[in-house]
Structure formats: structure tokens, C-alpha cells
UniProtKB/Swiss-Prot annotation:
Listed name of the protein: Acetate--CoA ligase [ADP-forming] II subunit alpha
Role played: Catalyzes the reversible formation of acetate and ATP from acetyl-CoA by using ADP and phosphate. Can use other substrates such as phenylacetyl-CoA, indoleacetyl-CoA and isobutyryl-CoA, but not succinyl-CoA. Seems to be involved primarily in the degradation of aryl-CoA esters to the corresponding acids. Participates in the conversion of acetyl-CoA to acetate and in the degradation of branched-chain amino acids via branched-chain-acyl-CoA esters.
GO molecular function annotations of the record: acetate-CoA ligase (ADP-forming) activity; ATP binding
Cytoplasm in keyword set: no
Keyword Glycosyltransferase set for record: no
Temperature dependence: Optimum temperature is above 90 degrees Celsius (at pH 8.0).
Organism of provenance: Pyrococcus furiosus (strain ATCC 43587 / DSM 3638 / JCM 8422 / Vc1)
Subunit annotation: Heterotetramer of two alpha and two beta subunits.
Length: 457
């Protein structure tokens, strides 16, 4: 089911080019890295494209073609699609623009493309899109740089914004499992793709950038089922009246009032993000298990960030855990007299890796704690190593191993880089701002409610 888009046995790039100024050049160059099957360039004029034997038509290709990427001028798209059908292609990504987004005539032409595709049993992503990626299969069927490998599937209705977010995540060392630019959604839409992604192994969460949904009822129906299996996070553009009008003119889809969308998301268990950063923060949280409740313990080596995080937690309707007396006494037994041993636990700036280990272990073992947020702000000094605090947290998590989620907030900018890398490698999502880690904790709690995790509070 739609797997031929993301793990195809053969790919044709129709409009593959030797001219670096053309999109077909970039798409083919990126796809040459794919190892899951053969990649064939199709170009009516060239014998070879980028050193690979080219074919005049997709029908001339000797091998099997599961997926075709169409990046030819608009006037050739229809005929190309018919040839794909005759060849037995299963999935088609149409990058070419100039269809439904241009008005009534374009919408009519787009409808015709879908009719042709369905006649041959093909499905379409696009038109007017950037393409698709599956980082777990080394598949980059776009004209942009491939995303880093991760476990969030990101579906974007805006190609340019989607590309911008991919570039942002590369810089911030955040990974995607899949990137799908849906364009005009003439055929496959959010609901179809969510349905497919619900059962994949490598996609732990699904993030959506939405401007407008064509079939609201089906979206709700599918989302209700999908959110019971894995989290869906939506960033909806066009909340204001002017934004809504802009969204409608951009993709040619119905934007609809934000109130309607908000109700639909709530009804179907979709988590709502208000910004790009919030969407990414929420989506990244799901390398962690889901919590049993909404009580959060905070440990920190500086007072300020602990208080700021407590404020953000409160804003989200989560609770600061009341630590057991036994936990408080044990913390007091090894932390300095100036340390604050009630939640948030402020171990003060002198805290070493061992203190992080012992504190994290006690907090995770406390039955009143559902989620742990471990904060490290103070840059290393007095002989501390750059990763000792992170190592302490990881050691505690591995030893206690009781299925409670742990999130990290490392705020010392470039000084924290190595520690953050180590935490992420061990599946602990690491953030730089209190509001981001709070968004992540909130997302975990909400998703636990979706799957019926019996969340208290």
C-alpha cells in the first residue's frame, strides 16, 4: 500500500537533464544515490544523462518501473502520464506546476490527470510539488538536499516551506524519516498518506503542514484511527481571516475557518502546533515512551531555567510532581546544603555527572513522577568534561529502565553540542529552550490520552 513510492524497485525520472539549471538535473543527480532499485533517466533528446544511458520514453525502459518522477514542461505531462500507465508504473510524482493552483482551467486539467492515473491503477503525488524522500532507503526524489535520517515523517502542503524546514532541520541536526511534498493533492492527500504511515516501522511520528483540507470528514475518520497508533502533529496555516484567504489562493484549496479545523483536530486526536519550532519539538519527543500521567519532575544545575520550565509546564496544563519524602531525604544526603531538593531540584552549578546520575535515578524511581526533564545550563568548568552530565542522565535511564519518558534541556549553546549529540544518540530528545521541552512533554501526555494510556489529570 503506497510502498512503491518509498521503496520502489525501479524509478524513471522523466525530464532528467544534463543541464544544471534544470530541475530534472537535480532530481536525477539526487536519485543516483538510491540503491533499492535501478534509476532510469528519460529524455527525448539525449543519449546519456549524467553518464547514464537515457531512454526516449518510459515505455522503452527494459526493467520494471514502480515509480515515475515527472519533471517535464506542463504541455507534455498528460502524454507522459499515459505512457507511464502503459508501462505499468504504480506511483507517479508530478513536480511540474501550472495546474489546479492556477484557476478553473488548471483544475479541469488536473482532474483529467487523476482520471488517466486511476484508469491505469496508478496513484499521484502532486502536481506542483517538490517531491518525496525516504531517508531510511536513501531515496531523495526531490530537487533539494536530502534531510538527515530520523524518525519523523513530515508531509507539507507548501513545497517551498517544506524545503525550508528540511534545510532548518539539517542545520539543527534534526532528522526526518520521510519528507512528502503533496503539492495540489490532486489524488493522494493527507488522509491517504497518514493511513500508509500508520503501519510503517521507521516513522514514529507524523508532522503535517496544512493550508487546506479537501475532504474534512475523511481526514477526521483516518486521523482518529492513526492517532491511536502513532502521534500526528499539525501546523495549520491560515488561522486568521487574511491568512485563510492567502492559503486558499496559494494552493487552490479550501482553507475554511480555524474554529472548524480546531474542532476537527481535537475530535481526531491530532496535536496542534502553533509554530514550526513547536511542531518539530513535539514530533521529536516520540523516541521516548508515553507517560502514565502528567506529573513532571525537573532537575537542573541553575535556578532560573528550572523556574522558566516550571512556568511553561504549568501553561500547558501539566503538573509539577510532589516528590515523596523519601526522595527528598535521599537527595539531601548527597547534594550540597545550598541545593533545592524540592521540585524543581536545583543541584546548583557545581553538580557533576555523578550528581546528575544519582538525582535522575531517584526522580525516575519516585512513584509520583511521570516525566523527567533534565536541564543543564552551566558550561563545563572546574575540570568537568563536556559530556559528563549527559552520561549521568543516560546511565540513570538505562539502570532504572521503568518506561518513564526523559527529555533534556541543554542550554549552553555550542558548549552543549557534544552532550546533546550523545543524548540524541541514546534516544533522549534534547532541546535548547524551556518552551520547546514543555511542548514535547505536553505532546507525550496528549498522545498517551489518545492511545488510552490512562493519563491522570
Amino acid at each position: 500500500m503506497l510502498d512503491y513510492f518509498f521503496n520502489p524497485r525501479g524509478i524513471a525520472v522523466i525530464g532528467a537533464s544534463n543541464d544544471p539549471k534544470k530541475l530534472g538535473y537535480e532530481v536525477f543527480k539526487n536519485l543516483k544515490e538510491y540503491q533499492g532499485g535501478k534509476v532510469y533517466p528519460v529524455n527525448v533528446r539525449e543519449e546519456e544523462v549524467q553518464g547514464v544511458k537515457a531512454y526516449k520514453s518510459v515505455k522503452e525502459i527494459p526493467g520494471e518501473v514502480d515509480l515515475a518522477i515527472i519533471v517535464v514542461p506542463k504541455k507534455f505531462v498528460k502524454q507522459t502520464l499515459i505512457e507511464c500507465g502503459e508501462k505499468g508504473v504504480k506511483g507517479v510524482v508530478i513536480i511540474t506546476a501550472g495546474f489546479g493552483e492556477t484557476g478553473e482551467e488548471g483544475k479541469r486539467e488536473e482532474k483529467e490527470l487523476v482520471e488517466i492515473a486511476h484508469k491505469y491503477g496508478m496513484r499521484i503525488i502532486g502536481p506542483n510539488c517538490v517531491g518525496i524522500m525516504n531517508t531510511h532507503a536513501n531515496l531523495n526524489a526531490t530537487f533539494i538536499t536530502v534531510a538527515k535520517k530520523g524518525n519523523v515523517a513530515f508531509i507539507s502542503q507548501s513545497g517551498a516551506l517544506g524545503a525550508g524546514i528540511v534545510y532548518k532541520t539539517i542545520k539543527e541536526d534534526i532528522g526526518f524519516s520521510k519528507f512528502i511534498s503533496v503539492g495540489n493533492m490532486a489524488d493522494l492527500d493527507f488522509a491517504d498518506l497518514m493511513e500508509y504511515l500508520a503501519d510503517t516501522q521507521e516513522d514514529k511520528a507524523i508532522a503535517l503542514y496544512i493550508e487546506g483540507i479537501k475532504d474534512g470528514r475523511r481526514f477526521i475518520e483516518v486521523a482518529k484511527k492513526v492517532t491511536k497508533k502513532k502521534p500526528v502533529i499539525a501546523l495549520k496555516a491560515g488561522k486568521s481571516e487574511s491568512g485563510s484567504r492567502a492559503a486558499a489562493s496559494h494552493t487552490g484549496s479550501l482553507a475554511g475557518s480555524w474554529k472548524i479545523y480546531e474542532a476537527a483536530f481535537k475530535q481526531s486526536g491530532v496535536l496542534v502546533a502553533n509554530t514550526i519550532d513547536e511542531m518539530l519539538s513535539m514530533a521529536r519527543a516520540f523516541t521516548q515512551p508515553l507517560p502514565k500521567g502528567n506529573r513532571v519532575a525537573i532537575m537542573t544545575n541553575a535556578g532560573g531555567p528550572g523556574v522558566l520550565t516550571a512556568d511553561e509546564i504549568d501553561k500547558r496544563g501539566l503538573k509539577l510532581a510532589n516528590l515523596e519524602e523519601k526522595t527528598i531525604e535521599e537527595l539531601r544526603s548527597f547534594l550540597p546544603p545550598m541545593a533545592a531538593v524540592k521540585n524543581p531540584v536545583d543541584m546548583i552549578a557545581s553538580a557533576r555527572g555523578e550528581d546528575y546520575y544519582r538525582t535522575a535515578k531517584l526522580l525516575l524511581q519516585d512513584p509520583n513522577v511521570d516525566i523527567l526533564i533534565a536541564i543543564c545550563v552551566v558550561p563545563t568548568f572546574a575540570g568537568m568534561t563536556p559530556t559528563e552530565h549527559a552520561e549521568g542522565i543516560i546511565r540513570a535511564v538505562k539502570e532504572v529502565n521503568n518506561g518513564k519518558p526523559v527529555l533534556a534541556l541543554f542550554m549552553a549553546g555550542y558548549v552543549s553540542e557534544k552532550a546533546k549529540e550523545l543524548l540524541e544518540k541514546n534516544g533522549i530528545p534534547t532541546y535548547e529552550r524551556p518552551e520547546d521541552v514543555a511542548a514535547a512533554a505536553y505532546a507525550l501526555v496528549q498522545q498517551a490520552k489518545n492511545v488510552g494510556g490512562g493519563v491522570n489529570g
